[in-house]
Amino acid sequence: MKELSSAQIRQMWLDFWKSKGHCVEPSANLVPVNDPTLLWINSGVATLKKYFDGSVIPENPRITNAQKSIRTNDIENVGKTARHHTMFEMLGNFSIGDYFRDEAIEWGFELLTSPEWFDFPKDKLYMTYYPDDKDSYNRWIACGVEPSHLVPIEDNFWEIGAGPSGPDTEIFFDRGEDFDPENIGLRLLAEDIENDRYIEIWNIVLSQFNADPAVPRSEYKELPNKNIDTGAGLERLAAVMQGAKTNFETDLFMPIIREVEKLSGKTYDPDGDNMSFKVIADHIRALSFAIGDGALPGNEGRGYVLRRLLRRAVMHGRRLGINETFLYKLVPTVGQIMESYYPEVLEKRDFIEKIVKREEETFARTIDAGSGHLDSLLAQLKAEGKDTLEGKDIFKLYDTYGFPVELIEELAEDAGYKIDHEGFKSAMKEQQDRARAAVVKGGSMGMQNETLAGIVEESRFEYDTYSLESSLSVIIADNERTEAVSEGQALLVFAQTPFYAEMGGQVADTGRIKNDKGDTVAEVVDVQKAPNGQPLHTVNVLASLSVGTNYTLEINKERRLAVEKNHTATHLLHAALHNVIGEHATQAGSLNEEEFLRFDFTHFEAVSNEELRHIEQEVNEQIWNALTITTTETDVETAKEMGAMALFGEKYGKVVRVVQIGNYSVELCGGTHLNNSSEIGLFKIVKEEGIGSGTRRIIAVTGRQAFEAYRNQEDALKEIAATVKAPQLKDAAAKVQALSDSLRDLQKENAELKEKAAAAAAGDVFKDVQEAKGVRFIASQVDVADAGALRTFADNWKQKDYSDVLVLVAAIGEKVNVLVASKTKDVHAGNMIKELAPIVAGRGGGKPDMAMAGGSDASKIAELLAAVAETV
């Protein structure tokens, strides 16, 4: 067997299948395009569904790929096992109605065993097959596989409800008795026992039947066009070919682990407690690729998955003694490992690093206190002999310290404790009720309290300086005022400060505090307004600080200027929106960060591409006009007379600041700005979207980021032009339109065929009328694509007097969907479905005339249908 790098394995895979007439399908973006059924691309075949379902006909029916994929259903197992990953790479070869079993098996065996290719020892390979699939068994024998290496497995049949299905044959590599301490042998395969001896490296799915849950498999009809769908995990192949004990000891992960060793000062022990190394290595791969593909950490959907992965990795970093931000430092290593096939990680390195670092910093503001609090809670449970972490304590970790509930649960379980989910939900509801009665101030300080409310010392923000000397007025540590502090995190108030407190959509400044010797004694990580308006500096204390002492306060000037570019551009954007789409387009929220600006505004429809172009052009014209920016302090009425617009979310006192950009823009604003519009450099809108009824959002970049955005657009256009074989960039649109027109025609034809098929199916279903207890009923299993189709059946049924009651069941994917409709007062559909649903391990409910339920046990569908007569 050849010892190859992961890059060599991937390339050899693609080269082999190219030699067999396959075209190479590039790896798709991890974020699915036009497929709302998927959160992530999760397999090699996921991007080829358009070919397998016939909506698009490939130019070449033979396809091979190496597809980056993400699966997050087993996050908790990552690091605990040898082979669980969130982000992985699936190698595949596919035949769309072309070659079938013979070639798939023969070529697969050739790739694995030929000295020209992988050169696996034949005696180390074992194959499983579906017992009734004698053709696959015979084909393996014809390839030279010993009968003793072929294991029949009843589960080797791929099907998801009705539709294409077929047997599959899996290929395993035997790593020997060293990985089988109890010497169980082939029973590990035959009985599907979890083990580290026989490693599944490849699965070949022979899609040859049209599954029909109403009949035995032996009666499934053959598909007119048979397909091949295979998947081989690159990480597993690399582990086998590199002689690694686990996937993590391969060249795909070890360079990352080595970097973690450097950062932590700890050594990775393949035979010891190495879970944290594995978690970090796995999660930073997923984060790097997902963020590079456009997904960002957030509070829902994909964003929540990324935030959860990042926070889990950070916590495992803490376990290794890494207490500073570190994950972003691993991004270049990920990029270097994958550069040969996925150059985009290094190309987008700066962006990915910044997103990861910012998210780390956000989490780090409270993680120390949160971890300490959790440790105290668990110690208290142990002392009291309890085994469950209470809901109110979970909520405090979640609400005050920012810990994800899943992370709390995982940490508690690691320590041998359970968590009170219901208690957490109750505490969450109480908090939501409180929020309705009073606004709770957010920010890194957590929540308002008496200590903060008691700050009455005066403090003044100085706009026009990046550094100044000031007296320290207030120190708060552990929620108590104190005269001095020498470590940990603290909140500080100075007599005056150059640090801008987060307000009006502009993020807070960061920077340093120095003593009279020029030594840095604290790092400012956040600034929020205290209840009485003073800038409240959240700092990491590095050396002694004491009230009444003078310190030098220095902001991060480069960061401030980047934020000012975006904030000033926001004013220009606001004015341009008024001019292009109307005065109604008023600000509904904004965020001016270092890397981008986000502007929310009221508007009743999506902004057209032409309007966006005009807006972008107008903003840039004002930048190039080099308009002088002036600020004036005056009263509100005078400001209004000057034509100033008030900003969303701001409360104005007697004296307000008016920011004027030439004669183009006049706004009330308490933020910081540039001196001249030309300093912005360039403005580029990167996204426009709806975020709620009547509210739109524009995300834009300025300066260097704007230039990068334009360059990326140009690169993308060049790639599109090359893909559609446009002779020049200007011809790309016409080429794409032609392809789109062709696709639309095919889709229309497909929809018409589906309509006809559904109508025919409905006629057959409604013919089978039964009667029980004087009630006429129809009970049938139907083949539909989604639950909505069941409702369509019911709507058609209502139009005529077919029966009094209709019961339909459909196996859709791994779920069972049940519908009950009733036209008679004697049968309550909602009550009836409550009796039927448990039969298929489900539950549901509804109205007297219509009810639906979902279940998970498709094997009990026939039993459910038989029970209808008893429940009417």
UniProtKB/Swiss-Prot annotation:
Binds 1 zinc ion per subunit. Disulfide bonds: none annotated. CDD domains: AlaRS_core (cd00673). It catalyses: tRNA(Ala) + L-alanine + ATP = L-alanyl-tRNA(Ala) + AMP + diphosphate. Zn(2+) binds at H567, H571, C669, H673. Belongs to the class-II aminoacyl-tRNA synthetase family. NCBIfam families: alaS. This is Alanine--tRNA ligase. It comes from Streptococcus pyogenes serotype M6 (strain ATCC BAA-946 / MGAS10394). The gene is alaS.
